[in-house]
Amino acid sequence: MSDVLSKKQQFSLKKLNKSLRKSTGQAIADYNMIEEGDRVMVCLSGGKDSFTMLDILLELRAAAPIHFEIIAVNLDQKQPDFPEHILPEYLQKLGVDYKIVEEDTYSIVQDKIPEGKTTCSLCSRLRRGILYRTAKELGATKIALGHHRDDLLATLMLNMFFGGKLKSMPAKLVSDNGEHVVIRPLAYCKEKEIEAYAKLKEYPIIPCNLCGSQPNLQRQVTKNMLNEWDVKFPGRLETMFTAMQNVVPSHLSDTALFNFKEIDKSSGVIDGGDLAFDKEPIKHHTEDITPIETQYYQQHQAVKIKQLT
């Protein structure tokens, strides 16, 4: 990060840091993500989200009433022109324990996936397997991923549009192989705050030229839609995320979640009866949004949306 920031930038950085720490700390507490004696493997991709996650977790650890370890892990997938020196230099300067895992998944993906097809599915499966193995080797008790609130919302929309499910990314889960606990400490954090924070911190961002840059991904299209909503209808994403934490099974249609067959007059009114829409507005904490972060997002993200449409 530059040694010299303007007073306005310093103020914005302080506000963003406070907001991100608060959101991350709240998510950790709500889901009991980190416990006494944990060894947390922080998956560092080189993107803005994982840099921010590592930064905030280190700060929270310094002030936490419990003791836990942090080790940063990066998977070098041998993509062409991958700058191998950046992360080791950054982590050494930061003074954090780390491990670089070298696995040529790039060649496997290129060999198996036809040209023009999205590579994310195979790439993510290979990456998960390697990270699970590494966590076991390191004795990690938790695996921390850098997905944020907007990722959770995009996944919810993707599953609704293309999977026929009301399903998102959980903030905490057991890994596919049943051997690890995976956590998402940034689950409550807004992407636009992370983006503004990373810009001010001047992290050495490493772009993903394997999957993240593919413009035809359904996920990217869905995120663009959500970003457009956020610009046109401020507060909509906050309301959507609140809905994910305020599920009413009796007013959905999943018989596995609610026993509709047993309902009769003696059951009484359940969760408001036949009110299909509760008109009481959701209150948002918009005062936590910093002016510089909002201005940066509106100027840059609106341009991206316009270009895509």
Swiss-Prot record:
This is tRNA-cytidine(32) 2-sulfurtransferase. Binds 1 [4Fe-4S] cluster per subunit. The cluster is chelated by three Cys residues, the fourth Fe has a free coordination site that may bind a sulfur atom transferred from the persulfide of IscS. It comes from the Bacteria. GO terms for molecular function: 4 iron, 4 sulfur cluster binding; ATP binding; magnesium ion binding; sulfurtransferase activity; tRNA binding. Its main location: cytoplasm. Pathway: tRNA modification. Its EC number is 2.8.1.-. SUPFAM superfamilies: Adenine nucleotide alpha hydrolases-like (SSF52402). [4Fe-4S] cluster binds at C120, C123, C211. InterPro entries: Rossmann-like_a/b/a_fold, TilS/TtcA_N, tRNA_Cyd_32_2_STrfase, tRNA_thiolation_TtcA_Ctu1. One of its GO terms (biological process) is tRNA thio-modification. One of its GO terms (cellular component) is cytoplasm. Its cofactor is Mg(2+); [4Fe-4S] cluster.
